[in-house]
Design a protein with these regions (language model features):
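Hydrophobic h-region of N-terminal signal peptides that target proteins for export
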Residues: 17-19
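Sec/Tat signal peptide C-region and signal peptidase I cleavage site
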Residues: 21-29
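Basic side chains
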Residues: 5-6, 26, 99
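N-terminal secretory signal peptides and thylakoid transit peptides that target proteins
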Residues: 1-15
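Mature extracytoplasmic or organellar-lumen-exposed domains after removal of signal/transit peptides
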Residues: 30-187
Length: 187
């Protein structure tokens, strides 16, 4: 007997149900639990009231920015690679915790009188804005080739966005140098 559309529509729902197949769930992250836990515990601050406790995180963040800038052509093959260094994709970059580190310095109970809290707060805000600009341009590079945007200088739209991100990273490095200068009384 040939099955017609009418026969199929008239059939009980039980016979139409597709077999249930349980597939293994895909991991939500690129990192296993041990890697995530190790990254979260990296640069943990033993005593949040001590301003010097944040210096290792801040120093490592500066080195990460320097590494990104020095190896840009190798790293910036796509926006997510840049964002991985900026701490917005994954948890392995020290910049992943930079907001908390900067805020922690400002909240520390043992800041020396020579430390300019207002200047540090303003420099922190400028740095975080530059970092956010770099992250936004790197994120946009992921999708720029699929949009109606046009690249400049004979480059693809994503290459243009990565070029903007590179300038943002350089601005962030300049802002960060100012932060490090302001941290001198803590050393």
């Amino acid at each position: 007997m040939k099955a017609t559309r009418r026969c199929i529509l008239a059939a009980p729902a039980v016979t139409l149900a597709a077999p249930v197949v349980t597939l293994p769930r895909r991991a939500n992250a690129l990192y296993d639990t041990a890697t995530v836990n190790a990254a979260k515990n990296t640069y943990d601050v033993a005593d949040a009231t001590k301003c010097k406790a944040y210096l290792p995180l801040l120093d490592a963040s500066g080195k990460t920015l320097d590494e990104l800038a020095a190896n840009w052509d190798r790293i910036a093959t796509d926006g997510d690679n840049v964002r991985r260094y900026l701490g917005t994709v994954g948890v392995t970059s020290p910049l992943f915790k930079i907001r908390g580190g900067l805020k922690g310095v400002l909240k520390a109970k043992d800041l020396p009188d020579a430390f300019d809290v207002v200047a540090f707060a303003e420099a922190s805000e400028a740095f975080l804005n530059d970092l956010q600009d770099a992250e936004g341009d790197a994120y946009g590079a992921q999708f720029a080739d699929y949009s109606t945007s046009v690249g400049s200088g004979g480059q693809s739209p994503s290459a243009t966005m990565l070029g903007k991100a590179r300038k943002d990273v350089e601005r962030a490095r300049t802002s960060y140098a100012e932060l490090l200068r302001l941290l001198a009384p803590l050393r």
